[in-house]
Amino acid sequence: LNYTMPIGPVSVTGGLIHYDFDGGDTQELYVTCALATLLNPSLSLYYDIDDGEGGFAVLAVSQAVPAGPLSLTAGASVGFNLDDKAMGTNADGEEFTGLYYGEVSLATSIPLFGNVTLDPRIAYSTALGSDGEDAITAISADGKKDIFYGSIAVTAAF
């Protein structure tokens, strides 16, 4: 659930995210400010209002490039944990504030009908900083600090 309000070249989006995890759910409030310029820089701040009781920040850039009838969007981001225990703990088993991950991605949006799109994405993500590496390797299914993954979303805008 989110709402976006354009303010000149800046768009401000706020919303609520519900995460449905095995063994426990959590929810976050978030706000993102994005600037419509070269590389489209954005800053997102998340605050876990349930299980994590902490925050998370993401600084990102992205650029769309025409590719036939579609466009491909290349992106990069850096995540910074702000004592959010839902993101994992450091080697001492404590929440931490510090670098968490870096990610590069490639995505597109394929119109299906009306305001509905199919949005595939691939990405490579790796832990940054020793605390981030400790947290990510502890909660990852394979104990590794990096992952290559893909996703597909169906989006309806109204």
Can you annotate each of these PLM segments?
Residues S44-Y47, K85-E95, D134-D142:
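Extracellular loop and loop/strand-boundary signature of outer-membrane beta-barrel proteins
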Residues A64, T73-T97, Y101:
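A mid-sequence, solvent-exposed acidic-amphipathic segment
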Residues L1-M5, L16, V31-L35, L45, ...:
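Residues on the lipid-exposed face of transmembrane beta-strands in outer-membrane beta-barrel proteins
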Residues P6-V10, A36-N40, P66-L70, N81, ...:
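Outer-membrane beta-barrel channels and translocator barrels
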Residues V10, D25-L29, E53-A57, G98-G102, ...:
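Residues that define the transmembrane beta-barrel architecture of outer-membrane proteins
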